[in-house]
Regions:
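ATP-dependent small-molecule kinase phosphotransfer cores
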Residues: 2-77, 82
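Generic surface-pattern signal
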Residues: 11, 15, 44, 75, ...
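Hydrophobic helix-cap positions at the C-terminus of alpha-helices
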Residues: 51-55, 94, 132, 162
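Local beta-strand N-terminus motif with an aromatic residue
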Residues: 57, 96-98, 137
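Short, well-ordered beta-strand core segments
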Residues: 60, 100-102, 140
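A glycine- and Lys/Arg-enriched "phosphate-lid" helix/loop adjacent to the NTP-binding pocket
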Residues: 64-131
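NTP-dependent small-molecule kinase module
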Residues: 108-162
Length: 162
C-alpha cells in the first residue's frame, strides 16, 4: 500500500517519469533502489503475514506471492542482482517454502491478453519468471493453447497433488 501511494505521488515529478514501472509510469533511480526495496517490502509484509496466519487455519490460494514480488522488484527496478542482496536472499528462502504454481503462456499470447503493458516490460517479466520458476515453482501450467476452463482444470489437478 505504501509503495503504491508513494509511486502515484512520485509519478507527478519529471525526475521519476519513465516506464520501467508501467503501472505507475515511474522509474526509480538506481541510487534509490535499496530504499525503494524497503518501501516495497514494507508494503508486502502485512499481506504476507496475513496470508501466513490464514494458512494456519485454511489453505490459501492467491495470485501474488513472494515469487511475484521478487520478479516485480527485479523487473521494475532493473535490478537483476536483487537476489544477491540481503532482502533478496531472505525472500528467496521464504519463497522456497511456498507452494508455487507457475501459470504461463508464450509471449505472443500474453501480448494478445494484456493491453496496457509494453512488450519490452512483458518480455523481461517472462524471462525472469521462466528462470525463477525452475527453482521456486512446484508445478508449471502452460495456458498458451488452453481455454480458461481447461487451465482451471489443470490448476485443480496441481492443487490436489500439493
Amino acid at each position: 500500500m505504501l509503495a503504491s501511494v508513494l509511486a502515484r505521488f512520485l509519478s507527478h515529478f519529471t525526475s521519476f517519469k519513465g516506464y520501467r514501472n508501467p503501472y505507475y509510469g515511474i522509474i526509480v533511480p538506481s541510487k534509490l533502489r535499496p530504499l525503494w526495496v524497503l518501501v516495497e517490502f514494507s508494503s508486502l509484509l502485512p499481506h504476507y503475514l496475513l496470508r501466513r496466519f490464514l494458512s494456519l487455519l485454511h489453505p490459501v490460494i492467491g495470485d501474488r506471492g513472494l515469487l511475484d514480488f521478487v520478479v516485480w522488484i527485479i523487473v521494475t527496478l532493473d535490478y537483476p542482482r536483487f537476489l544477491s542482496s540481503f532482502t533478496g536472499r531472505f525472500l528467496a528462502r521464504l519463497a522456497v517454502k511456498e507452494k508455487n504454481v507457475y501459470v504461463k503462456a508464450d509471449p505472443a499470447t500474453l501480448l494478445r491478453r494484456v493491453v496496457d503493458i509494453p512488450p519490452s516490460f512483458l518480455a523481461k517479466e517472462v524471462a525472469c519468471y521462466s528462470v525463477l520458476a525452475k527453482y521456486y515453482a512446484s508445478y508449471t501450467i502452460d495456458t498458451t493453447s488452453r481455454t480458461p476452463m481447461e487451465s482451471l482444470g489443470e490448476l485443480l489437478k496441481c492443487l490436489r497433488r500439493l
